[in-house]
Regions:
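Feature marks hydrolase-like catalytic cores characterized by long aromatic- and Gly/Pro-rich stretches
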Residues: 1-111
Length: 111
């Protein structure tokens, strides 16, 4: 909270023109492995920070659940959205761009 608050305060009125995306390139398994850690998994988490988010302060997600029957291949969180969709849709909404053209420009193999 302090990091984002400091960034917001430093940017002042430009905070509403700023979009910060945080994402990882891989998730983690739900279950612990033999050494008490977790292995690389399938689904991950991503966050947006901005002064202009329509749902600011809320968690917006399609939560698949963590019951064994809800896991991907019985061990990973089930993906509900590709990163390419998350990133291109966030940029398109924030900067009032056409989402189809934005996705095609940023991720031509995904469009």
């Amino acid at each position: 909270d302090a990091l984002i608050g400091t960034l917001r305060d430093a940017l002042g009125s430009e905070w509403s023109n700023t979009l910060v995306m945080v994402a990882t390139e891989f998730g983690r398994t739900v279950a612990f492995n033999g050494t008490g850690g977790t292995d690389h998994g399938t689904a991950s988490a991503a966050m947006l920070f901005s002064g202009a988010l329509a749902n600011g302060g809320n968690i917006v997600a399609d939560w698949p659940g963590m019951k064994p029957s809800q896991l991907y291949e019985g061990r990973d969180l089930k993906p509900t959205m590709r990163f390419e969709q998350f990133a291109s849709d966030a940029l398109a909404r924030h900067y009032a761009l056409d989402p189809v053209k934005t996705r095609a420009s940023l991720f031509p193999d995904f469009a």
